Amino acid sequence: MLSARTLIDRDGITLADVSCAHGAGRGEDEPARTSHGLVFVRRGCFVRTVGARTCVLDPTMAYGANPGEQERIDHPHDNGDDCTWLRLDAGLAAALYGGDPRLPARSLPTTPRVDLEHRRLLAAAGRGGSDEHALVERAIGLAAAVLERDAPARVASGRPATERARRAVVEQAREALAADPAQSLPELGRRLAVSPHHLSRVFRALTGATVSRHRMRLRVRAVLERLGGGERDLARLAADAGFADQAHLCRVVRAETGTTPSALREALA
């Protein structure tokens, strides 16, 4: 009656498309949850009960979930529901929510912007072929947007307080990525002792690019250098530069430069 399709599973994040075919009526007590996360309702309506707390959830809502919570889901109507599950490991949940990984286990209204971003993220992850670092960065931003509306002070805590501190964090992130572009946003956050959400936001504000876009640009510049040095094997170049495959390399290089690696190879060699 419940099916789930995992679309992202890396860097402390899982994004899954979850469908429930439960008919109208009272549900059964579910096993206790084992992880932190946010659930976004896309279709249907149900009533979630955890202990003495009950909330009605529909496509204008999300809710937080935590390890140890035992819930019961009741459906007032037939046809079940469709939801998106965004799991966060404890360290990432704590970094996003002011140091405490325990997320608000209640209904969390989603704005039209947040709902649309959530659906776009789900679609991009489901299509495949997307930069997984970019998907992770978007997922972190989505979680922060929902939590920030509920507890802005908690989400804001840990943000570099001064312009000088923000610039220092961005410079340190650029140094780290120049040494190893494969580092993920959560890894950078841990390395620099800053919330990945704040790092992403400050990085974009000061550079005009997301962390994932900057990472991809570093990889494209490395590709151009290799092409200028006479590299002929695009499959090998894609693997060395950190692209998923040759097709991924070609898409990104064309998006960044307006032309193909083959044409650039002839122009630069």
What are these regions (language model features)?
Residues 1-8, 262, 266-269:
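Actinobacteria-biased recognition of intrinsically disordered, low-complexity terminal regions
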Residues 2-103:
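N-terminal regulatory/effector-sensing and dimerization cores
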Residues 97-159, 173:
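Amphipathic alpha-helical segments enriched in hydrophobic/aromatic residues interleaved with Lys/Arg
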Residues 115, 119, 136, 140, ...:
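Conserved terminal C-lobe alpha helix of the protein kinase catalytic domain
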Residues 122-129, 145-154, 172-187, 203-207, ...:
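Basic, amphipathic alpha-helical hairpins
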Residues 162-173, 207, 216-219:
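N-terminal positioning helix adjacent to the helix-turn-helix/winged-helix DNA-binding module
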Residues 182-221, 238-267:
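Basic/polar phosphate-binding segments, predominantly the helix-turn-helix DNA-binding elements
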